[in-house]
Amino acid sequence: MRQTKALIQRIRHINTQIQHVELGIEEDLSDIKPGQSLLIRQDEAWHPYLREHWWPVLIGSQKLIVERPAGLKYEPGNFINVLGPVGTFFRFRRNLRHMLLLAYDTLPTPLLSMIPMLIANQTSITLVLLGTASSYKTEHLPAQVEVLHGTGDLEWDNRVMTVGLADQVFAVVRPDDEILRFSKIWHMLGDLRAEIPSNYLFGMFQPVQPCGAGACHACMVRLTQGTALSCTDGPTFDLTQVKL
């Protein structure tokens, strides 16, 4: 991870909920991969102390597109201070044919950067928006992504078939109690499958990250054997290894 800067090049208002901010990036960020993120400070002031956590949804040559709430104001031509890339990239199973993405009571934004890669590899994708996530508008997503809506009780139409087709599952949940919500997803899938093998169900953690470099340990995740840091070892963890 390095400290660098990025140029806000273009703002695209997607809908009433979100906007896409296109960033021109320096060579220091050119190796960022899907699953990694950025810690942003918009000016040189130290207030607020904590940086904003930005998730790319599209990674291109010398540019990134990040998804941000529609109500925030950004100015093209402004430079922002960046720490990144933060974390490690997504890891997929071999011979992956169908990916199931779950967003539970939170926006699916952290998961979206994998979609172009999966489509390029002809992997089918189902995105299930659960609970409050069901209000997320998806018209801007590629047509290849199947979008389903479910309840806060993790129910949706044809759930058994959806889970049965999935070779791998990635989930993101509201950060206020990630362990509780990941536990609910774990038990739901456990009721539908004979077993949950390793390298099948992954949770994407979004704790507060004061440093992003593994120095403060504020983003520690408890594992069945030891601990890990979301900023250096995550943000994605195999839930068979997490202490739920």
Regions found by a protein language model. Give the residues of each.
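Ferredoxin-reductase
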Residues: 2-78
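A generic structural signal for residues embedded in beta-strands
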Residues: 40, 81-83, 221
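Short, Lys/Arg- and Gly-enriched loop/turn segments at beta-strand edges
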Residues: 45-55, 86-98, 231
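FNR/FR-type flavoprotein reductase catalytic core
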Residues: 74-209
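Nucleotide-activated chemistry modules centered on ATP-dependent adenylation/adenylyltransferase
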Residues: 189-193, 213-214, 224-225, 235-244
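Local cysteine-cluster metal-coordination motifs and their immediate loop/turn environment
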Residues: 204-235
